[in-house]
Amino acid sequence: HWMFKDMPTYDWFHQFPGYKQSNYRMTTQYDKNGSKIDAKLCMDGWFVPSMPDLNQSNPLVLNYLTQNAIWWIEYADLDGFRVDTYSYNDKEGIAKWTKAITDEYPYFNIVGEVWMHDQAQISYWQKDSPIAKIQSYNSYLPSVMDFTLHDVFGNVFNEDRADWSNGMIK
């Protein structure tokens, strides 16, 4: 990848011998009995070959991402960010980044894409989540995309009949 030609540090990106794609096993991020190998590959594997995975456990990377976000907020007078694939990031790193941004800009909104279809799983990533608190974790994320609601709307508005078990009445 072209970004590897002049890295600021040797560990700026997650690197493996050969290409390693994420296994997309997001539930490993909060399952205390989940496989540590699966959790690491979910967080550290690349999402796709064209998107190198930044090593957010590297303090220099995290500082760069924070400064870059602040620059964009100031330069473009932004009110919020949508963070794609929020739950694939280094869990502690993304929480530090989110807290740094919201501490600096208390009214700034960050919406995290957590593409899961269960409210309990999605709520883990919400700021001050009682579920995440069980593991002493707080993402500091003000808003999480509600894919459970997305799924319901997709079904409701695409069903031909409206009765007790279909469509809007359901």
What function would you assign to each model-found segment?
Residues 1-51, 150-170:
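Core domains of carbohydrate- and sulfate-ester-processing enzymes
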Residues 2-8, 68-70, 74-79, 85-170:
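Active-site-proximal helices and loops of the catalytic beta/alpha 8
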